[in-house]
UniProtKB/Swiss-Prot annotation:
Family: Belongs to the metallo-dependent hydrolases superfamily. Adenine deaminase family.
The keyword Hydrolase appears for this protein: yes
Protein name (Swiss-Prot/TrEMBL): Adenine deaminase
Manganese in keyword set: yes
UniProt superkingdom: Bacteria
Origin species: Oleidesulfovibrio alaskensis (strain ATCC BAA-1058 / DSM 17464 / G20)
């Protein structure tokens, strides 16, 4: 804070000049003292100056409403919303979100450093603060083809050039690389050693967890089991409770732990939140609603969505409502149900903020696919059973199934009667012609196909379907629109959604993106698709760092073995 600003604030706190805003008579959820008390909120130059009565240029009557700090999401991939940073901010701010810790490894896997620069530029100066964590694993594994590679020197470069925007290193997904002390992984950890280093350690326990923590990662958002959560908290990790889109729900399983332990090292995160979930259910407000309904006391719940996150990421004077803190706060008509009345960012009412002036141009075509034809989908009959990816509803983990094939004319084919769909991942960054083939159970498709360039983490072109020709039709539509989502059946495209920003996001108005996504979801519903957020489920079937079985453009990945395995068991 500059001296002239400090002088102004000190003077305003002593009634030397009117404050800009006074919100009178609120019940403040004080995340610093851990209580709820009466207060006025006085704001000058976007900063809280006191809880007392002040002369003000603008007065808002709180009328006893609860006031909570602006909420902070400790781990989100903005790209997963399908919205550009500015469009996302406009959609999230009315839900009480004041800041997010964004990991742009989705666009980084497509465009490398250029993609990170785009996210930094597109989010600069937004009223909703977007902090950008430096992606640690691009590509996520050696078993897939990404559009770029980021090395330790890139980590050093970005963290040194953007000290105020980039708190540290994003989720270190390559935990085997930490345990085996891979040279490049260790170099990245060393480059970020003085910064925050986020972890990513699903099911990691015991001595392996000890070794991982000693390497530098200090948090984890992949915990889905209560005993696992207890161990990670006892070993000093910052536990991020993930409650995001349709495939990421960990809160219910971990509530008992939150009521047993001191929660100062616990935060809530959304991770991946698709635009329809964001607009229909909310953002961090939705997580708080669920947390309090599950029995977590309101003050503790709010702390886990504000001050705990701010302290972990070393955000100065953020995450609370108190003198000297940025004036991000939310007025609630009802605390328990998180019924929001008004939101303020830097002392400005969100309803009066224009987010549209922050859009950044993007023109690159990032979809380059070779070999899109039905011949590329042929799976010749083999020996033994098929290794099949079994979808777990509501989770990003999958089961590794071994099932007998359905054969036709010497080839393994999809079988709607068994809920067995064919799955393909086409490399789309360099036109190599790579295609990985497999099968998945649990989509619920009766016919047709769906395709998209949103496929974690390398974001190649992923296609699932019951008919090879429909799979190619859907894939060709995605290529034609420059990336996005498409549904096809009986040789024609039923619906599609263009995502021209790296095949991941759109800068179209939120309402247009939402309408497009609803269109593809409705088209899928006519084909029998049964999962609540269709493309979110498909997008994670290629995520080769989450157990158990996944598919990349290089083939079927056994995540536990961390190697590519044959499609056939014998």
């Amino acid at each position: 804070m500059k001296n002239n600003t400090m002088n102004t604030l000190i003077g305003a706190a002593q009634d030397e000049s009117p404050v800009d805003l006074l919100v009178r008579n609120v019940r403040l959820v004080n995340v610093l003292s851990g209580e709820i008390h009466d207060a006025h909120i006085a704001v000058k130059d976007g900063i809280v100056v006191g809880f007392e009565e002040y002369e003000a240029l603008h007065v808002v009557e709180g009328n006893g409403r609860h006031c909570i700090p602006g909420l902070i999401d400790g781990h989100i991939h903005i790209e997963s919303t399908l919205l550009s940073p500015a469009r996302f901010a406009a959609a999230a701010a009315p839900h009480g979100t004041a800041a997010v810790m964004c990991d742009p490894h989705e666009i980084a896997n497509v465009m490398g450093a250029e993609g990170i620069e785009y996210m930094l530029h597109a989010s600069a100066g937004l009223p909703l603060s977007v902090y950008v964590m430096m992606p640690s694993c691009v590509p996520a594994t050696h078993m897939e083809t990404a559009g770029a590679t980021l090395r330790a020197e890139d980590v050093q470069d970005f963290l040194s050039r953007y000290p105020d925007r980039m708190p540290g290193l994003a989720e270190m997904m390559n935990y085997p690389g930490v345990l085996f002390r891979d040279d490049e992984v260790m170099a990245k950890l060393e480059a970020a050693a003085s910064h925050v280093i986020d972890g990513h350690a699903p099911l990691l326990r015991g001595k392996a967890l000890n070794a991982y923590v000693l390497g530098g990662p200090a948090s984890d958002h992949e915990t889905s089991d209560a005993d696992e959560a207890r161990e990670k908290l006892r070993k000093g990790m910052h536990l991020m409770i993930r409650e995001g889109g349709s495939q990421e729900h960990n809160l219910e399983e971990l509530v008992t732990v939150l009521n047993e332990f001191n929660t100062q090292n616990v935060s809530f995160v959304s991770d991946d939140k698709v635009v329809n979930d964001l607009m229909e259910s909310g953002h961090m407000d939705d997580i708080l609603r669920k947390a309090m309904a599950a029995g977590i006391p309101p003050v503790r719940a709010v702390q886990m969505a504000s001050i705990n996150t701010a302290r972990y990421f070393r955000l100065h004077r953020r995450g609370a409502v108190a003198p000297g803190y940025r004036a991000d706060f939310v007025l609630l008509d009802d605390l328990q149900t998180m019924r929001i009345s008004e939101c303020y960012l830097g002392g400005r009412n969100v309803k009066e903020i224009d987010f549209t002036g922050h859009s950044a141009a993007f023109s690159a075509n990032t979809v380059h696919v070779a070999g899109l034809n039905t011949d590329s989908l042929h799976v010749a009959a083999g020996n033994g059973n098929l290794r099949v990816i079994g979808i777990v509803p509501g989770q990003v983990i999958t089961h590794a199934l071994e099932l007998p094939p359905t054969l036709r004319e010497g080839a393994a084919v999809a079988d709607p009667s068994r809920d067995l769909a064919k799955l393909a991942v086409f490399e789309r960054h360099k036109g190599t012609g790579n295609v990985g083939l497999g099968f998945t159970a649990g989509l619920g498709l009766h016919k047709g196909a769906l395709a998209g360039t949103v496929s974690h983490d390398s974001h190649n072109l992923i296609v699932a379907g019951m008919d090879d020709a429909d799979m190619i039709t859907a894939a060709e539509e995605v290529q034609c629109i420059g990336g996005g989502l498409a549904v096809a059946c009986d040789g024609r495209v039923l619906a599609s959604l263009p995502l021209p920003i790296a095949g991941l996001m759109s800068d179209a108005p939120v309402e247009d993106v939402l309408a497009g996504l609803r269109g593809v979801n409705e088209a899928l519903a006519t084909l029998g698709y049964k999962l609540s957020s269709p493309f979110a489920a498909l997008a994670f079937l290629s995520l080769a760092v989450i157990p158990s079985l996944k598919l990349t453009d290089k083939g079927l990945v056994d995540v536990h073995k961390f190697e590519i395995v044959p499609l056939w068991t014998a």
